[in-house]
């Protein structure tokens, strides 16, 4: 069986079907949560500073707005901001226009100030930023039964960030990487992760 199709199949099951027996693993790389975090990382990688303020490139921003996890985490204020950004359809979006709700303020701040620098402090800030996004989004969707599987991926994503942080900065180490290298390393590490469901019902996750 193709594990990459499992998330889509599970998401299509009606809510009135309460117990689903799953006998295969769910790959991180095919999850909505991984997709969302990939867009979040891309937003950081494409931030630019012009005329005294930060801007975000539109494509990863719009991709994030279309992600189901992000949409379910959005409150009314976030939805209003997203609607306004879509109407304006700017190529580069000022950071100030992407603020105004706890979710937006967490996501749309800059942790990668110089993508060409292999600064250890910048990578540490980038990793902590990604962890904060996970910690912010997960509670906002945790009560949604349709997001139960994605919450398992949120836990694994956070674990992966902690692990890579320990490798780079544990025991007093300060290993610098280019942000692009960090993103690739994280993708390689998390892309092979799967959440195992071996003959267990999905209820209660």
State what each model feature region is.
Residues 1-205:
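Polyanion-engaging groove/track-forming segments
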């Amino acid at each position: 069986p193709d594990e990459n199709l499992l998330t889509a199949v599970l998401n299509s099951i009606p809510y009135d079907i309460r117990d689903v027996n799953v006998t295969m693993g769910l790959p991180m790389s095919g999850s909505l949560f991984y997709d969302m975090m990939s867009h979040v990382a891309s937003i950081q990688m494409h931030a630019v500073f012009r005329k005294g303020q930060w801007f975000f490139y539109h494509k990863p921003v719009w991709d994030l707005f279309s992600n189901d996890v992000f949409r379910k985490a959005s409150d009314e204020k976030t939805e209003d901001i997203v609607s306004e950004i879509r109407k304006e359809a700017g190529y580069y979006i000022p950071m100030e226009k992407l603020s105004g709700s706890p979710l937006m303020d967490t996501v749309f701040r800059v942790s990668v100030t110089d993508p060409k620098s292999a600064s250890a402090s910048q990578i540490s800030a980038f990793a902590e930023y990604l962890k904060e996004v996970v910690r912010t989004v997960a509670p906002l969707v945790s009560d949604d039964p349709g997001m139960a599987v994605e919450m398992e991926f949120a836990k694994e994503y956070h674990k992966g960030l902690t692990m890579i942080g320990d490798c780079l900065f544990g025991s007093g180490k300060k290993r610098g990487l280019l942000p692009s290298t960090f993103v690739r390393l994280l993708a390689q590490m998390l892309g092979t992760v799967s959440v195992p469901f071996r003959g267990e019902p999905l209820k209660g996750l």
